[in-house]
């Protein structure tokens, strides 16, 4: 994908609803752009800059490693503080965090995952829904989401897109994409 592809599907505001077929707002990434901003993990340019971000410390979440570039770590810290102040029943979705930095490609592709730039966090492994588990060929994807939309809204307020907004959904996945959400907020 190129830069125009990244903005092809407008990121929705408001309630979480089943996305239109093949609408994946914020899921497309241009590696050249992200390598320039965050570094290329395959060349060792990301890991050496990662910082420890406290993750919902009142709930015993420990720390997670995240990129400090472009305000990503600051944004995640703000998410953490807001989630920490949320209802106690959110804890089961937040602790433990299921993963942040991991220099890897997206399954079945040669494209680097957002985790490889240190800008993605996965939560709630036990309560996650993922399109591939329901329809590996992607022909009859049935939308499912068990993560409270209020949790997703916290991330979105701080510049993260949520995989529950994608037709090819990945409800545990949040990635720092201020370029996508900044455009959405201006409309």
Show the residue positions of the predicted features.
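A cross-kingdom marker for long, charged
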Residues: 161-187
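Cell-envelope/glycan interface and biosynthesis
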Residues: 1-166
